[in-house]
UniProtKB/Swiss-Prot annotation:
Entry-linked InterPro entries: IsoCit/isopropylmalate_DH_CS, IsoPropMal-DH-like_dom, Isopropylmalate_DH
GO molecular function, one term: magnesium ion binding
Positions of Mg(2+) binding: D218, D242, D246
Source organism per UniProt: Deinococcus geothermalis (strain DSM 11300 / CIP 105573 / AG-3a)
Purpose: Catalyzes the oxidation of 3-carboxy-2-hydroxy-4-methylpentanoate (3-isopropylmalate) to 3-carboxy-4-methyl-2-oxopentanoate. The product decarboxylates to 4-methyl-2 oxopentanoate.
Name of the top EC class for this enzyme: oxidoreductase
Catalytic activity annotation: (2R,3S)-3-isopropylmalate + NAD(+) = 4-methyl-2-oxopentanoate + CO2 + NADH
NCBIfam families: leuB
Similarity section: Belongs to the isocitrate and isopropylmalate dehydrogenases family. LeuB type 1 subfamily.
Location of the protein in the cell: Cytoplasm
Protein name: 3-isopropylmalate dehydrogenase
Length: 351
């Protein structure tokens, strides 16, 4: 029996995770779902944002479904020592799972083009997957320092680090439209020269059926807004991926529509990208679409059930058209939207 660990977390996390878990139970009744604490909620209960009992539960998990972590800006959690803050629990979780590749789909669903800040003709049909390296680069290198009026950080990658995340991108492209755009700054950065060399060599050895091109990060930052439909899979390192994925996140028009997956050698981590929204927590009005679409990614990448994942995505798209949530200009609350997704699963256009 497959095991999925749910970590509802803080703010609206428990509400959207409950909605997502309800959908998961409906479409995969054989899955054992086990709930554990993380973030501020875990600190309040156990004095640790990533308690040992949560860590232990991951050992035999097939996938992890995360809600949201953190509180308001004036939350007393922000006055805690940094290792005890909710966000430290999230970082510890990612380290424990060894997640080295983040997958961020950017899709404009049919009938929802009006939500995008782009013109409808630019937004229509956008379907991008950004694959970002998560554990290396300038964010994690230990060679860093502030000394008087001088500071430095080091961007460093090795061939094995580049190849393992590139394999994820090429594999994803094989399931999609067969095109990968590798993003770097090889005209000025030696680390990008290595990145470009290793990505190209891997493609030439193992993925000759995938079309690969290389583009500079500044060019992609412009073109992903001016002509987003030109991209299929975007592969990039940690810093560039952090910026590009947040830039692309505005294209669908709401963070409430954005799921994500983080993959590594262990169970994958699946989560909506939106924050904990403490201002609306407990009111039952949070949009659970991103959490439910994270379940679709979990089914596809964590449990290898792509057909069921496709059904969930189609059901969410139908529910969004017929029962939009309040953040999208509609009236549906969390419960109403979740039921709409479950009802849509029985629609001929979904099944």
């Amino acid at each position: 029996m497959p095991k999925v660990v749910t970590l509802p977390g803080d703010g609206i996390g428990p509400e959207v995770t409950a909605a997502a878990a309800e959908v998961l139970r409906e479409v995969a009744p054989d899955v054992h779902i086990e709930e554990h604490a993380i973030g501020g909620a875990a600190y309040e209960q156990f004095g640790d944002p990533f308690p040992q009992r949560t860590r232990d539960a991951l050992g035999d998990a097939d996938a992890v479904l995360l809600g949201t972590v953190g509180g308001a800006q004036n939350s007393p959690w922000n006055s805690l020592p940094r290792p005890l803050r909710p966000e430290s629990g999230l970082l510890a979780l990612r380290r424990a799972l060894g997640c080295y590749a983040n997958l961020r789909p950017v899709r404009v669903l049919p009938g929802l083009e009006h939500l995008s800040p782009l013109k409808p003709e630019l937004a229509r049909g956008v379907d991008i997957l950004i694959v970002r390296e998560l554990l290396g680069g300038i964010y994690f290198d230990g060679d860093r320092k502030i000394e008087g009026d001088t500071a430095y950080n080091t961007m460093r990658y090795t061939t094995p680090e580049v190849e393992r995340v590139a394999r994820v991108a090429f594999w994803a492209a094989e399931q999609r439209r067969g095109r990968v755009t590798s993003v770097d700054k090889a005209n000025v950065l030696e680390v990008s020269e290595l990145w470009r060399r290793d990505v190209q060599a891997l493609r030439d050895r193992e993925y000759r059926n995938v079309h690969l091109n290389h583009e500079y990060v500044d060019s992609v930052a412009m073109l992903i807004v001016a002509n987003p439909s030109r991209y299929d899979v975007i592969l990039t390192e940690n810093l560039f991926g952090d910026i590009l994925s947040d830039l692309a996140a505005v294209i669908p028009g709401s963070l409430g529509l954005m799921p994500s997956a983080s993959l590594g050698d262990g169970p994958g981590l699946f989560e909506p990208i939106h924050g904990s929204a403490p201002d609306i927590a407990g009111q039952g009005i949070a949009n659970p679409a991103a959490a439910i679409m994270s379940v679709a990614m979990l089914l596809r990448h964590g449990l290898e059930r792509p057909q069921v994942a496709n059904q969930v995505e189609r059901a969410v798209a139908l529910a969004l058209r017929e029962h939009p949530t309040r953040d999208l200009g509609g009236q549906a609350d969390t419960r109403t939207f979740t039921h709409a997704v479950l009802d849509a699963m029985g629609s001929p256009s979904v099944g």
